[in-house]
Amino acid sequence: MDPGGQDLLALDPGDQDLLGFLLEESGDLWAATEPDVKASLDLELSPSENSVQELSDWEVEDLLSSLLSPSVSRDVLGSSSSSILHDHNYSLPQEHVSIDLGECEMISCRGRRELTGLAGSTFPFADTESFEKEGFHVTPLPGEERAAEQEMSRLILTEEEKKLLEKEGLTLPSTLPLTKVEEQVLKRVRRKIRNKRAAQESRKKKKVYVVGLESRVLKYTAQNRELQNKVQRLEEQNLSLLDQLRKLQAMVIEIANKTSSGSTCVLVLVFSFCLLLVPAMYSSDARGSVPAEYVVLHRKLRALPSEDDHQPKPSALSSELPMDSTHQSLDSSEHMFLVSSNFSCVLYHAPQAEQPLHWPLWDLSSEMLFSDSNLLLQANLSESEGWQPNHSPSLVIFQGRYSG
């Protein structure tokens, strides 16, 4: 056995572990050979350790896998300030690993020191949770605690807050905690930013509302113009209708006046036609009602002088006429009629006489006697004409007053 191995056996077990770790880090200088290491391990264990049941292979593999698991916390790795960039490869001979129950405290203390050194390195497979599950206690480095505290105590300001602070000429520290004055300044700045945003929102809403109002005003203005034009057209139509109504009223009044005058004219015409037609109809009816044995002689005579001067003359004329001449005229075929000037009809009755072939001619020129208002008519019927009455003739004298 070489003197290096004797020195290792003379050292304390904790010092031997530390020395072995240093030798491995320094490139295995003064490293003992494998048999020496085995001998030293055997010497480290007490006689009672030989009686302890050795760990099985799968338990050792489980322990190694837990130590070499890749689930390492990124925060711990990122915040590590260690400058060691190489990995540590630890190889433990499985056949020489044995744990005594009486030395659990020593192993835990030694493992704590080893894990403390490993945690400070950039070992990518270190998992603190797995170590804690296995019974190891992991303590973070002071540098990591400082980095986490610095990140948590750092004051984060937005761009608007920075601009407003620069505009007001104020400065705030980048670390926490802040003083009361600084907190008031920060609150005031943030309140201004909130008010600014609220004002912007209100202005935006107001602008939208004003735009809507302007559009509505334009719309209602156009409608108002259309309604005004419509009202003007309706007023013009109303005036034209009023003019037409006045014209119609004037026409109705004129038509009413014309109707009254026309009706009057029509009534006058109807009355005149009645006056003209009724006598003609009456005369035709009277002529149709006269029997065949009556002969009508119509003659209208007018008296030239006045009636008052010649009123007593008819009686004188009648008295002057001799009875003999009257009887003589009655006995003869001559018939004398004394007729007043107001009467013009003389009826001659011949009930049993035969109707002549033609009307006899009246000879009035030789036998007519005019005496003022009285007219003496004489009718001569010659026997040669063949129409003679079978009865005695009668003398009819009509007298009347002339009403001029």
Swiss-Prot record:
Positions annotated with a glycan in the UniProt record: 342, 380
Record note on modification: First proteolytically cleaved by site-1 protease (S1P) that generates membrane-associated N-terminus and a luminal C-terminus forms. The membrane-associated N-terminus form is further proteolytically processed probably by the site-2 protease (S2P) through a regulated intramembrane proteolysis (RIP), releasing the transcriptional active processed cyclic AMP-responsive element-binding protein 3 form, which is transported to the nucleus. The proteolytic cleavage is strongly induced during dendritic cell (DC) maturation and inhibited by DCSTAMP. That form is rapidly degraded. N-glycosylated.
TM regions (residue ranges): 262-282
Functional description taken from the UniProt entry: Endoplasmic reticulum (ER)-bound sequence-specific transcription factor that directly binds DNA and activates transcription. Plays a role in the unfolded protein response (UPR), promoting cell survival versus ER stress-induced apoptotic cell death. Also involved in cell proliferation, migration and differentiation, tumor suppression and inflammatory gene expression. Acts as a positive regulator of LKN-1/CCL15-induced chemotaxis signaling of leukocyte cell migration. Associates with chromatin to the HERPUD1 promoter. Also induces transcriptional activation of chemokine receptors.
Motif annotated as HCFC1-binding-motif (HBM), chain positions: 87-90
Motif (LXXLL motif 1): 19-23
Organism whose genome encodes this protein: Mus musculus
Keyword list, A-Z: Activator, Chemotaxis, Cytoplasm, DNA-binding, Endoplasmic reticulum, Glycoprotein, Golgi apparatus, Membrane, Nucleus, Repressor, Signal-anchor, Transcription, Transcription regulation, Transmembrane, Transmembrane helix, Unfolded protein response
Family under the similarity heading: Belongs to the bZIP family. ATF subfamily.
Cytoplasmic face of the membrane: 1-261
Disordered: region residues: 305-327
Lumenal compartment spans: 283-404
Organism phylogeny: Eukaryota, Metazoa, Chordata, Craniata, Vertebrata
Segments carrying motif LXXLL motif 2: 64-68
Entry superkingdom: Eukaryota
Region of interest: Leucine-zipper: 227-248
Protein name, as recorded: Cyclic AMP-responsive element-binding protein 3
Gene Ontology MF term list: chromatin binding; DNA-binding transcription factor activity; protein homodimerization activity; RNA polymerase II transcription regulatory region sequence-specific DNA binding; sequence-specific DNA binding
Name of the gene encoding the protein in the UniProt record: Creb3
Membrane topology, record value: Single-pass type II membrane protein
Domain bZIP intervals: 185-248
Subcellular location: Endoplasmic reticulum membrane; Golgi apparatus; Nucleus; Cytoplasm
Stretch list, region Basic motif: 187-225
Assembly and oligomerization: Homodimer. Interacts with HCFC1; the interaction is required to stimulate CREB3 transcriptional activity. Interacts with CREBZF; the interaction occurs only in combination with HCFC1. Interacts (via central part and transmembrane region) with DCSTAMP (via C-terminus cytoplasmic domain). Interacts with OS9. Interacts (via leucine-zipper domain) with CREBRF (via leucine-zipper domain); the interaction occurs only after CREB3 activation and promotes CREB3 degradation. Interacts (via C-terminal domain) with CCR1.
